[in-house]
A protein has these predicted regions:
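Alpha-helical transmembrane segments and their lipid-water interface positions
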Residues: 56, 82, 86-94, 116-119, ...
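Selective transmembrane alpha-helices of multi-pass membrane proteins
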Residues: 99-128, 184-191, 199-207
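Selected transmembrane alpha-helices and immediately adjacent juxtamembrane segments
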Residues: 147-155
């Protein structure tokens, strides 16, 4: 290989200079390609977990239909930041801590079951009340708490940090969290915006 490089050198006085120059140009391109592939993989995972139907997104849809898009932004922001906090704590070792405290993990598991049961009951009894209590738009803290009782959020946080955060160190975990924040915020906002056109229909009094 070294003979081939010396034979193809563009600088006869410097053996292998052409080969080294070629590799020097290829290495940044290869690094850029790998970085882009990683970012696309992160974004694809975050989008798949954020945009698909779930309790938080259904609440955003119902809130948009009942109260409009602007009033639903508190829930959107609260749910986003609540999940990002969960994601960061998973990256800092929350999952390993819960494995050492089975009682805490069991408490969270049953809290999620009760929460999903309550959501199903609200949908069954009165779908117009799914987004809050007494016709009030869901608050910031309501959205944040929902994520901590949402099994889908726990699954996404554990899988995401396991795939992209743990092996890459603090920098990659922070990059993943920042990217997830933007995608999660936009995804939940899309559900709230999708429900807002229905607001006028819900406000029409029955004849």
């Amino acid at each position: 290989m070294s003979g081939y490089c010396r034979g193809r050198s563009q600088f006869p006085s410097i053996p292998g200079a052409g080969c080294r120059l070629g590799w020097g140009l290829l290495l940044p391109i290869r690094a850029l390609f790998m970085e882009t592939s990683l970012l696309l993989s992160m974004a694809g995972f975050a989008l798949a977990m954020s945009i698909t139907p779930g309790p938080v997104n259904l609440v955003a849809l119902g809130s948009g239909a009942r109260h409009g898009f602007a009033a639903s932004l508190r829930h959107v922001v609260g749910a986003t930041l609540g999940f990002i906090l969960l994601l960061l704590l998973m990256g800092l070792g929350l999952g390993a801590t819960l494995l050492q405290w089975p009682a805490a993990a069991e408490l969270l598991r049953w809290g999620g079951v009760i929460f999903l049961g309550w959501m199903a009951w609200q949908l069954l009894v009165d779908s117009s009340r799914v987004e809050g209590v007494d016709g009030v738009a869901p608050s910031f803290w309501y959205g944040a708490l929902m994520q901590w009782l949402n099994p889908k959020a726990w699954l996404a946080a554990s899988m995401g940090m396991g795939a992209y955060g743990s092996a890459g160190g603090v920098g990659q975990a922070a990059l993943f969290s920042g990217l997830y924040l933007v995608i999660c915020l936009c995804s939940i906002a899309c559900w709230a915006y999708a429900g807002s056109p229905l607001q006028g229909l819900l406000l029409v009094p029955p004849r």
